[in-house]
Amino acid sequence: MALNLLSPAEVKALSFLDSTKSTRFPKLCPGGITLHRKDCRVPLRRRVHCSLQQPPPAWPGRAIPEQDLCNWNVPKPISIIGSTGSIGTQTLDIVAENPDKFRIVGLAAGSNVTLLADQVKRFKPQIVAIRNESLIGELKEALADVEEMPEIIPGEQGVIEVARHPDAVTVVTGIVGCAGLQPTVAAIEAGKHIALANKETLIAGGPFILPLAHKHNIKILPADSEHSAIFQCIQGLPDGALRRIILTASGGAFRDWPVEKLKDVKVADALKHPNWSMGKKITVDSATLFNKGLEVIEAHYLFGADYDNIDIVIHPQSIIHSMIETQDSSVLAQLGWPDMRIPILYTMSWPDRIYCSEVTWPRLDLCKLGSLTFKSPDNKKYPSMNLAYSAGRAGGTMTGVLSAANEKAVEMFIDEKISYLEIFKVVELTCDKHRSEMVTSPSLDEIIHYDSWAREYATTSLKSSSSPRPVTA
């Protein structure tokens, strides 16, 4: 079986930022983002290194397991931020199947009182938080018959207390959006290792989070399938061996749709993912390919990869979860069924590998699968890639603004306030507006401020723009 991979720099875009102070970005031509493709026929004249800026030792590719992560003779104590969401419920499935390996210390949720109460009764945590403070009374009432009542703390402070509970060793961060940033900071400062399923933590807060993790000697272990795959592939590589990261994408709900048909997309269409079972927001992100654009930025921060050395390939079967290319042109890949439990389990058990019964964890059979296929992503169908690469190259607060604007746009689309194609327009307009205020090395307060600003601006961006820059479907 031959892997027909993308050549380096297959999908690149000019920045929408003002380039007057930089030689890296040509100025925009009127009418929006202009695409340029490198001439792939020109031979490589130098050895390609994955990054000019070395990542801190906290990055998982060079993480060395310490004694507190090895040889657990008792169940490892875990806290979950976002326990009622897709990541949280799958994490609890793993804990339920492996009670001798893991135990739950803390649970934090947003507003799903019924499910949270059921989780508390089953897993018996020591501390519980519900972010929606108005629901604290309802939660206490639902837990009135519990023999050992956990400590219950409402609001954002409650979520932070769950994240930094002294008994937890690892914190699984499954909250969608920038809401996961402050709990992650609290967990790192309290010395907890992070099982990171919240993309926005690094996309918005990478310049702040990584030095903080380095300072506290904390391991940030990726719990999404693509970055977990990269993490697994690069372990054991010597310094300087990594040449290129290749992120695979299913193509989402519209991978087989003609571009012309996208103007007719309904919410129900976007929520039909062909391979994965996920929450609404990430499923729409898979349809727009914004999830992959955000993952490019996350890979940059996690693995120190330069954007010129991070590529995307459409892989409809979602069996290869991502690949790396080494300096000698070898390609290493991690394969498995599309099951989020596998990368989640690995972040919880790392550096160990836990046996999983094939009754509940089907084993991969390539002979039965038959074939794996690959193709280049379509820039016209997925304008999100251009926006993400541009924001990533800009860095600073621009990546957080991109993420927040997309999150708000997806919310408006699901609520049927905007059309599918307007998701891309909202994000581009918001990023374009932010370019004059972008902060290159933001503080945590600035990251949070511009996250809030982006959501607010995105809400009215289509109305407030007198001459919006067009985004081709």
Curated annotation (Swiss-Prot):
Its cofactor is Mn(2+); Mg(2+). GO terms for cellular component: chloroplast stroma. It is found in: Plastid, Chloroplast stroma. Pathway: Isoprenoid biosynthesis; isopentenyl diphosphate biosynthesis via DXP pathway; isopentenyl diphosphate from 1-deoxy-D-xylulose 5-phosphate: step 1/6. It catalyses: 2-C-methyl-D-erythritol 4-phosphate + NADP(+) = 1-deoxy-D-xylulose 5-phosphate + NADPH + H(+). NADPH binds at T84, G85, S86, I87, G110, N112, N198, E200, G279. Residues 1-49 form a transit peptide. 1-deoxy-D-xylulose 5-phosphate binds at K199, S225, E226, S250, H273, S286, N291, K292, E295. Mainly expressed in leaves, and, to a lower extent, in trichomes, roots, flowers and stems. It comes from the Eukaryota. Mn(2+) binds at D224, E226, E295. This is 1-deoxy-D-xylulose-5-phosphate reductoisomerase, chloroplastic. The gene is DXR.
